[in-house]
Amino acid sequence: MLILTRRVGEALMIGDQVTVTVLGVKGNQVRIGVTAPKEVTVHREEIYARIQREKEQANGRGQVSESEFTEEAFRAAPAISGSGE
C-alpha cells in the first residue's frame, strides 16, 4: 500500500486520467473528490462489495448488467451528508 500525505486542496493522480482531490477534513472524516472518465466506475468500498455480492448471487439466475447492480446498490446505500454524494 502506498501511503501519501495531502493537505486540503491538494490532489493525487492515478494513471493519466483519474484525479483524487482532498476537499476537506472534519474530525475523523476526509471528503475527497474523484475526477475520472465516465467509463471508469468509482464506488465507495461498501457499495463495491455489495455490487460484487449481488453479481455472485445473480450468477445462478442469469445475466444482469453492471449498471443494474450499480443502480440497485445506490438505492440501497445509506445516505451520505454533503453535496454531490
From Swiss-Prot:
Any single Pfam family the record assigns to this protein: CsrA
Main location: cytoplasm
GO terms for cellular component: cytosol
InterPro entries named among the record's database cross-references: CsrA, CsrA_sf
SUPFAM superfamilies in UniProt: CsrA-like (SSF117130)
GO BP terms: mRNA catabolic process; negative regulation of translational initiation; positive regulation of translational initiation; regulation of carbohydrate metabolic process
Recorded superkingdom: Bacteria
Keywords from the named record: Activator, Cytoplasm, Repressor, RNA-binding, Translation regulation
Molecular-function annotations in GO: mRNA 5'-UTR binding
Subcellular location: Cytoplasm
Alphabetical list of PANTHER family matching this protein: CARBON STORAGE REGULATOR (PTHR34984:SF1)
Subunit and partners: Homodimer; the beta-strands of each monomer intercalate to form a hydrophobic core, while the alpha-helices form wings that extend away from the core.
Matches recorded under HAMAP family: CsrA
Task performed by this protein: A key translational regulator that binds mRNA to regulate translation initiation and/or mRNA stability. Mediates global changes in gene expression, shifting from rapid growth to stress survival by linking envelope stress, the stringent response and the catabolite repression systems. Usually binds in the 5'-UTR; binding at or near the Shine-Dalgarno sequence prevents ribosome-binding, repressing translation, binding elsewhere in the 5'-UTR can activate translation and/or stabilize the mRNA. Its function is antagonized by small RNA(s).
Protein family membership: Belongs to the CsrA/RsmA family.
Designated name of the protein: Translational regulator CsrA
Organism: Nitrosococcus oceani (strain ATCC 19707 / BCRC 17464 / JCM 30415 / NCIMB 11848 / C-107)
Lineage summary: Bacteria, Pseudomonadati, Pseudomonadota, Gammaproteobacteria, Chromatiales
